């Protein structure tokens, strides 16, 4: 069953690349054509890479791994927070803290400090602190929530990163590379594919494109959680037990995965037709490019 259809990718503008003057020559193999001064990404390749990414994320989470969702640009912040929270994965949608991966021990201390401050009674008089002291601590807590709130349950370095805009998140990419952590990312036409182990050629600037692809990665994580929760087959080593907060999340992702599966069944005919005739897909993509109102990324 298809993870996503060609129509969904077209409707979300995943095929729109940057202007031809802003590109990375290494991305040439992922480009279908040029139209109105901008590149059009080959969605046939995007579909193939999406399937590979989906399988990797599902298996990683099923075996006890964690996917860190990273996207600090405005177009990605909401989708990153919503989808990561939906499947109980950590996320960073504000400023990336230097050393978050390479100096995780220090970050863990800041997380412990945040949880310590959360225990204080800021409204009552039982804390033993003056109003001024409480105000200072409240401001400290708010700052920690903003920068670390998305990784509060991260107890060790993640198994992989999902990144929106590899150029903007170059610090996260560099730290992951130093530690040998696989990177899954959207590759726009100005990106360097050599930095990413699991690329998805696509538009990393449009909100709809970012939301769709992030939702797909979250669905894969949800399916992995469900598999981890199921009884392992005889002779297969059991995965790490689910934490309580993960168990609470299982019901919602399971329902959403089922609903998504039912929706995809109805669209499988369109996908089969698109794959059977690549020329028709190209024509459809160019027609959609004229019809879509969204302006290509600059």
UniProtKB/Swiss-Prot annotation:
Keywords: Ribonucleoprotein, Ribosomal protein
SUPFAM superfamilies: Ribosomal protein S2 (SSF52313)
The keyword Translocase is assigned to this record: no
UniProt cross-references to InterPro entries, sorted A to Z: Ribosomal_uS2 (IPR001865), Ribosomal_uS2_bac/mit/plastid (IPR005706), Ribosomal_uS2_CS (IPR018130), Ribosomal_uS2_flav_dom_sf (IPR023591)
Superkingdom classification of source: Bacteria
Gene3D superfamilies per record: Glucose-6-phosphate isomerase like protein, domain 1, Helix hairpin bin
GO cellular component, one term: cytosolic small ribosomal subunit
UniProt GO MF annotations: structural constituent of ribosome
Disulfide bridge positions per record: none
Keyword Acyltransferase applies: no
GO annotation, biological process: translation
Family: Belongs to the universal ribosomal protein uS2 family.
The protein's name: Small ribosomal subunit protein uS2
Lineage: Bacteria, Bacillati, Actinomycetota, Actinomycetes, Micrococcales
């Amino acid at each position: 069953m298809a993870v996503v259809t060609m129509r969904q990718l077209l409707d979300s503008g995943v095929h729109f690349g940057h202007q031809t003057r802003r590109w990375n020559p290494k991305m040439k193999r992922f480009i279908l054509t040029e139209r109105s001064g901008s590149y059009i990404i080959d969605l046939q390749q995007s579909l193939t890479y999406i399937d590979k990414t989906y399988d990797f994320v599902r298996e990683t989470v099923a075996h006890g791994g964690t996917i860190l969702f990273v996207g600090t640009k405005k177009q990605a912040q909401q989708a990153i927070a919503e989808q990561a929270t939906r499947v109980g994965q950590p996320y960073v949608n504000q400023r990336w803290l230097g050393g978050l991966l390479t100096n995780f021990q220090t970050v863990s201390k800041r997380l412990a400090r945040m949880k310590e401050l959360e225990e204080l009674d800021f409204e009552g008089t039982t804390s033993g602190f003056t109003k001024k002291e409480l105000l200072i601590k409240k401001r400290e807590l708010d700052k920690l929530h903003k920068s670390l709130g998305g990784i509060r349950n991260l107890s060790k370095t993640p198994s992989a990163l999902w990144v929106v805009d590899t150029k903007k998140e170059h610090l996260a990419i560099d730290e992951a590379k130093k530690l040998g952590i696989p990177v899954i990312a959207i590759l726009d036409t100005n990106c360097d594919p050599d930095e990413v182990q699991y690329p998805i050629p696509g538009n990393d600037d449009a909100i709809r494109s970012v939301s769709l692809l992030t939702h797909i990665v979250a669905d894969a994580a949800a399916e992995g959680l469900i598999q981890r929760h199921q009884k392992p087959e005889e002779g297969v080593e059991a995965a790490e037990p689910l934490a309580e907060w993960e168990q609470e999340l299982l019901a919602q992702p399971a329902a959403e995965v089922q609903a998504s599966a039912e929706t995809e069944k109805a669209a499988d005919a369109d996908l089969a037709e698109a794959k059977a005739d690549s020329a028709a897909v190209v024509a459809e993509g160019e027609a959609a490019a004229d019809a879509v109102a969204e302006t290509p990324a600059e």
